[in-house]
Curated annotation (Swiss-Prot):
Protein name as it appears in the record: Cytochrome f
Family, similarity comment: Belongs to the cytochrome f family.
Keyword field: Chloroplast, Electron transport, Heme, Iron, Membrane, Metal-binding, Photosynthesis, Plastid, Signal, Thylakoid, Transmembrane, Transmembrane helix, Transport
Name of one Pfam family that matches: Apocytochr_F_C
Quaternary state and interactors: The 4 large subunits of the cytochrome b6-f complex are cytochrome b6, subunit IV (17 kDa polypeptide, petD), cytochrome f and the Rieske protein, while the 4 small subunits are PetG, PetL, PetM and PetN. The complex functions as a dimer.
PANTHER family: CYTOCHROME F, PTHR33288
One of the record's GO cellular component terms: chloroplast thylakoid membrane
Chain's gene name: petA
Organism of origin: Marchantia polymorpha
Primary site of residence: plastid
Cofactor: binding comment: Binds 1 heme group covalently.
Length: 320
């Protein structure tokens, strides 16, 4: 009897523990799923549209700069750095999902040419590993290893990120050629304004849904407001709801027009995209170029020597 009670007690505690883990996991992953660039991975087969626009701009509406630095040319089957810079003012704070203020995170998507991919860990030089730090890059999908994503990561530490890239070898990869290739990058700082389902986050401005008079403003316990507007045409009431975070810029008794901002725009981040070019250089071409330069230098040396020899002969004839 005691053993049965003990077993029942263990089962109850196990069920409670599993329930707690499920709740924590749900909260954790829901917060992560609201973060970039996982939205793009879940909603788009390719992050770059046919127009050249990177889909992250669908959720991050403000435009901000981003920069990328790559070598002018690389040799086949070599590891090189792609440095992505996402600048912003480190002193500013953003509105978090709970309405409080916090530091900005950053994220990036790097679209490489076919054949280029993330360098294996054993191929990355120690000095490059130091620059990379604790960043964890991952392919956009199993069939798109040439597209890399990272984030969200702390912006104060990683506003400049080093991607270790492995170049293809045309000798073993028939799809690769010795050509000039484009590289595209998208980078954002801060949270987005729109979720993929079209709903607003609390990091954006909230507008009036009708034209009318603000008859009541109710502040919700967990933050945010319920704003009651009396329609100017027939007097029916509409309640517009703003999430915790944005601050009201209207007051009771005020007349508002449809789409007029009811709150400020708390967004301090934004998204930007850029591009660069890298040449996959043929080693034989470099060798040929070196041989050409060497032959030119030798020809110049022989020309100088021949000229001096000719001058000596002329001088000898004059003395004779």
């Amino acid at each position: 009897m005691q053993n049965r009670n003990f077993n029942n007690l263990i089962i109850k505690w196990a069920i409670r523990l599993i329930s707690i883990m499920i709740i924590i996991n749900t909260i954790f992953w829901s917060s992560i799923s609201e973060a970039f660039p996982i939205y793009a991975q879940q909603g788009y087969e390719n992050p770059r549209e046919a127009t050249g626009r990177i889909v992250c701009a669908n959720c991050h509406l403000a435009k901000k700069p981003v920069d990328i630095e790559v070598p002018q040319s690389v040799l086949p089957n070599t590891v090189f750095e792609a440095v992505v810079k996402i600048p912003y003012d480190m002193q500013i704070k953003q509105v978090l999902a709970n309405g409080k203020k916090g530091s900005l995170n950053v994220g990036a998507v790097l679209i490489l040419p076919e054949g280029f991919e993330l360098a294996p860990s054993d191929r990355i030089p120690p000095e490059m590993k130091e620059k990379i730090g604790n960043l964890f890059f991952q392919p956009y999908s199993n069939d798109k290893k040439n597209i890399l994503v990272i984030g969200p990561v702390p912006g104060k530490k990683y506003s400049e990120m080093v991607f270790p890239i492995l170049s293809p070898d045309p000798a073993t990869n028939k799809e690769a050629h010795f050509l000039k290739y484009p590289i595209y990058v998208g980078g954002n700082r801060g949270r987005g304004q729109i979720y993929p389902d079209g709903s607003k986050s609390n990091n954006t401005v909230y507008n009036a849904s009708i034209t009318g008079k603000v008859s009541k403003i109710f502040r919700k316990e967990k933050g945010g407001y319920e704003i009651t507007i009396d329609d100017i045409s027939d007097g029916h009431k509409v309640v517009d709801i703003s999430a915790a975070g944005p601050e009201l810029i209207i007051s009771e008794g005020e007349l508002v027009k449809v789409d007029q901002p009811l709150t400020n725009n708390p967004n301090v981040g934004g998204f930007g995209q850029g591009d660069a070019e890298v040449v996959l250089q043929d080693p034989l071409r470099i060798q040929g170029l070196l041989l050409f330069f060497g032959s030119v230098i030798l020809a110049q040396i022989f020309l100088v020597l021949k000229k001096k020899q000719f001058e000596k002969v002329q001088l000898a004839e004059m003395n004779f």
